[in-house]
A protein has these predicted regions:
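Long, low-complexity, intrinsically disordered polar/charged segments
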Residues: 1-5, 9, 53-64, 158-175
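Short, surface-exposed acidic
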Residues: 30-36, 61-64, 112-113
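Residue-level marker of alpha-helix boundaries and capping positions
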Residues: 25, 70-71, 93, 171
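C-terminal cap/substrate-recognition subdomain and adjoining C-terminal extension
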Residues: 76-90, 97-215
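Active-site neighborhood of HAD-like aspartate-dependent phosphohydrolases
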Residues: 1-54
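Short, contiguous strand/loop micro-motifs
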Residues: 21, 66-68, 133-134
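Metal-dependent phosphoesterase signature
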Residues: 46-82, 87
Length: 215
């Protein structure tokens, strides 16, 4: 059976909501206005995030990357990668945030990621210009569109917030925490609660019958 794991980045791989912190830090007034509207689903992520990003001067891009450099990765992520590699199951990172931020935080783990899909930024003008290969619907990175690229028998999603909702609704096996868990409860969509990636690894090991029932 061919399997694949799709994993969000901000607030999922990272302990904190890295991208939201960047928006609030580099565009505080617009973020204070638009982020609550996005969480309340009164404004789409596609429109709100674009407006905030394109208000940030291009000259500040190095500061954005430096701001995220020391973000903490959630415990167990490396162990999950070890487990998935042993099972020959690829992990794909799908982030609604900036590609550069993801690459800075993951660092030496990047070669172990099967693929990374995120928002690209053009800094050749005065302000950020957003480019996204998978922009569509309500999202700058339409995660369901990304998932459709991968033809496998079993898809697993891991996430934590609003940017993961559409992905979670379209995936049979979902690990959800924080805001995503709340949204899924509203939609009456079953999910597996989790706090760290060791829990994800151990659940998948049991699901795939890789450990005995009495362990």
């Amino acid at each position: 059976m061919k399997r694949i794991v799709f994993c969000d980045f901000d607030g999922t791989i990272t302990v904190k909501e890295t991208f939201v912190a960047v928006l609030k830090h580099f565009a505080p007034q617009l973020s204070a206005q638009l982020i609550p509207q996005m969480y309340a689903r009164e404004l789409t992520l596609r429109e709100g995030v674009r407006r905030i990003l394109e208000s940030i001067p291009s000259s500040r891009y190095p500061e954005v990357l430096e701001f995220t450099r020391c973000e903490t990765i959630r415990p167990g992520f490396t162990e999950l990668l070890d487990f998935l590699e042993a099972q020959k199951v690829p992990l794909v990172v799908i982030s609604g945030g900036l590609r550069g931020m993801v690459e800075v935080v993951l660092g030496e783990l990047i070669p172990r990621i099967h693929a990374l899909h995120a928002v690209d930024i053009d800094t050749s003008g005065e302000y950020f210009q957003v480019n996204s290969e998978f922009e569509g619907g309500t999202e700058l990175v339409a995660k369901v569109q990304v998932m459709e690229k991968y033809l496998v028998d079993e898809k697993i999603a891991i996430g934590d917030s609003l940017t993961d909702l559409n992905m979670a609704l379209e995936t049979p096996i979902v690990f959800a925490r924080d805001r995503l868990a709340q949204y899924l409860e509203e939609h009456q969509k079953p999910y597996i609660p989790w706090q760290d990636f060791l829990e994800v690894r151990d659940y998948l090991a049991k699901l795939w019958n890789l450990v005995s029932n009495d362990e």
